[in-house]
Regions:
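Flexible "arm" and connector segments at domain edges
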Residues: 1-68, 72-116
């Protein structure tokens, strides 16, 4: 990933504006947003279905971009609906993961933290 900003506040604001202009917030309960995230994640997974591990990047990049964008957009809307600050919750999760997966135990291992 580039060392640029992950996501500009302007982009987050555009997502919320798009939703609000259509008066869709009334339909965006945490349950329905979680379902939508799961469905869009499944569509992202479908991009890889029946493909070899070494064939994905260039051939499927456009579909990957669209489906990943959908997952992220719904994630932004869920955070907004639940009053969560994206930067704060991501930083908190990184701290928790660092505790679960200390470098000295997790480096070069793919196992879950309970198996390290």
């Amino acid at each position: 990933m580039r060392k640029e900003t992950f996501m500009k506040q302007e982009t987050i604001d555009q997502v919320i504006k798009f939703r609000d202009e259509r008066n869709w917030k009334q339909f965006h309960t945490p349950k329905d947003l979680a379902i939508s995230i799961s469905l869009e994640a499944a569509e992202l997974l479908e991009v890889f279905q029946w493909s070899r591990d070494d064939v994905w990047c260039e051939e499927k990049m456009e579909n990957m971009r669209e489906e990943l964008a959908d997952v992220l957009i719904y994630g932004i809307m869920m955070a907004d609906t639940c009053g969560m600050n994206l930067d704060e919750i991501i930083q908190e999760k990184i701290r928790k993961n660092a505790e679960k997966y200390p470098v000295e135990k997790a480096r070069d291992h793919k196992e879950k933290y309970t198996e390290l």
